[in-house]
């Protein structure tokens, strides 16, 4: 048995490898901090009030727009206030995106990937009316129409993208109390989400139909102002992100091929940990595959859902690997049989399975439906919000249980190592130094695993944070959010790259010896190596299971049984 590269690699070569990987990690942080802008940008668009054209309310191919030839005439607030019915069923709120800047017409780029719209509603109640304040759960019915056009199209050539009649529930509070009316400001509500930003210009028309028999929009007084916040991924961040993926993808695929070839050279079946390393590398390669380049030429509204699925597969595989990685280094096994996922780890992985299924169901309920209707949101109804929150809480509880259990397993491994180190003084000096070196390397790798796990949890939280926590200061030279995201992404690749290298079978072959000559010959080899400039922590021949890949585990189990 030749052991792993972690056990056989010399101290100098291991230092060079670790230093190189650390430099790559620093480069990933600097790439995001110095060259990438914030991951998401936004633009605030105030709704332009236009008078609807009679007879065209039900024509989904008719659009009112505020800029360009044939633009609608904006209505003044005074005109609306003087109307006894506040121009009910006559108003259309127009949002044309993106807004011009410095008298220049701006357009969206396909590098910006996606577009999310949230709506701020301000409503007013007349002091003379019977209804003077909104109810607790105010239901608002909105006729939403989203259109698009491209640079080469005429100003009037708007095409329908999506149409839907949606209900939203408002939670409002008084902002200004006047003699004639009271103004209420409502919490932001989600309006739409586009998984692909394929066109240059977008147009949104909102109508608030009032229908007495259906009791539609009878309780919200009259609309005062509407403000749309359009959130998009920054094109500069997308370019840096795809550059990082493009650079990392071939390295991970190449190291996987190299690793599997070394495993197949051995005269044994692959161990469970070797299978898990291969699966983990495959999940990372699937995540690294820069499919986003296709969105530059093809409209792919399902890219957000696909990205979530890819990241979910990677998270599930990474979390499962950490449990198996710690479990396979337990020094006293419950059963002497070969480890399998089903026999030893189904209880350990139950929290991972529950959490991943919860997030997957939530994602399908949200973004899966948005492929047909971008205005849909599971958060719009009280029941839907409770169901969505229950899925998120369930996933969060599973994540907390998982992390605590992982820390317990690592602590148990360290405790077992400490207990078994009491047998080291009875060994020869060369053999004791050999195993002390292995224990030191393994502890360092375990601590790196815990650090990676902690940063992964932090990165997941930052990725799920609402982009309402936007950085409004545009003068920050180093964007911590971008640096953290690219740094964590690079850390995943570097960590898995290092694991695949260090746990690959070593090419060093040691001669087969009789048991009586084992200790003498091994000590002579190690002492001879120790006298050289670089000490090789070679694997000592033993009668352990030939499927073992770690001589540290083999040693401690042998000591325990002895």
UniProtKB/Swiss-Prot annotation:
The positions flagged as glycosylation sites are 58, 103
Q: What ranges are annotated Cytoplasmic (topological domains)?
A: 1-13, 261-270, 333-344, 412-441, 504-562
Q: Which residues cross the membrane?
A: 14-34, 240-260, 271-291, 312-332, 345-365, 391-411, 442-462, 483-503
Q: Does the keyword DNA damage apply?
A: no
The residue spans the entry assigns to the Lumenal side of the membrane are as follows 35-239, 292-311, 366-390, 463-482
Gene Ontology CC: one annotated term: early endosome
Primary location: membrane
Q: Which named protein is this?
A: Protein wntless
Q: Which organism is it from?
A: Drosophila virilis
